[in-house]
Regions:
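Tandem repeat scaffolds
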Residues: 6-43, 49-253
């Protein structure tokens, strides 16, 4: 799936994703209301291209300041990427997990990327690993993932869960492993894929170090595979209520 961006004037700092009602400018707090703390000040309209080349606007987001993002990531500062468009990933570094085993965890107060889009024109492998987050969820609610192989491994959330609620996962593989969650105010320790929309994608778990719940409530997918293996632990609960998933494989569950 191909996306393009066009710079736009945005003096009101209004951002939205998927539908203009999902915006930081809203009455109440139904949708994410924070915006990034590492923005560049540059706003873009994001368009999805159909196979015929027709453009459909799907978001209006801010481009992050990548130099500042790299600094915040490696200096363990609080990171908010809400309502951003991210298509550069050098700030994560270039080491794969087996090259950093034994390194100390980096500790953050919080990391969120709600209503953000992560996009690569060509399939790209990226890692979020060896992180300890003190407060809130590792939150990708309403986010979009395009053409990525995303590994989220060796993550500890002291007072939160991993959230992909209402995310759009397009031609992307998400691998989860070694995740420990402290739970949140309303939910026991879990990884949530509630209400996701996925197409031509794959979601996998392996080498789980805690008995977590996985929630796919009302998930809608096309040509998407979910492969769940909790070893050496077991799953606490699995929820597929009202979900439509192309293929589910359970191993050692």
């Amino acid at each position: 799936m191909k996306l393009i961006t066009k710079e736009v004037s945005n003096p009101e700092k209004k951002f939205w994703i998927w539908d203009e009602k999902i915006t930081n400018k809203q009455d109440g707090r139904i949708y994410p209301h924070n915006t990034t703390n590492i923005g560049s000040g540059k706003s873009v309209a994001v368009y999805q291209l159909s196979e015929s080349g027709k453009e459909e606007q799907i978001a209006q987001l801010e481009i992050p300041d990548y130099k500042k993002l790299e600094e915040y990531y490696w200096q363990e500062k609080e990171i908010c990427l809400d309502y951003t468009y991210i298509d550069e990933f050098e700030w994560l570094g270039d080491k794969v997990p087996y090259k950093v085993e034994g390194n100390p965890y980096r500790e953050y107060e919080k990391i969120t990327a709600r209503a953000a889009i992560f996009y690569s024109e060509e399939p790209k492998l990226i890692h979020l690993m060896q992180l300890k987050i003190q407060s809130e969820d590792l939150d990708f609610s309403y986010a979009g993932f395009y053409n990525l192989n995303l590994d989220i491994c060796d993550i500890t959330l002291v007072n939160g869960n991993v959230e992909f609620r209402d995310a759009h996962i397009i031609e992307t593989e998400i691998l989860l492993g070694g995740i420990e969650c402290g739970g949140s105010r309303y939910f026991t320790p879990e990884v949530s894929f509630r209400y996701i929309k996925a197409r031509k994608s794959k979601i996998l778990t392996m080498l789980m170090t805690q008995s977590l719940s996985l929630d796919f409530l009302c998930a809608k997918t096309e040509e998407t595979e979910v492969c769940l293996d909790p070893l050496p632990k077991t799953f606490e609960n699995l929820c597929f209520v009202k979900s439509n998933i192309s293929q589910v494989k359970l191993s050692n569950a």
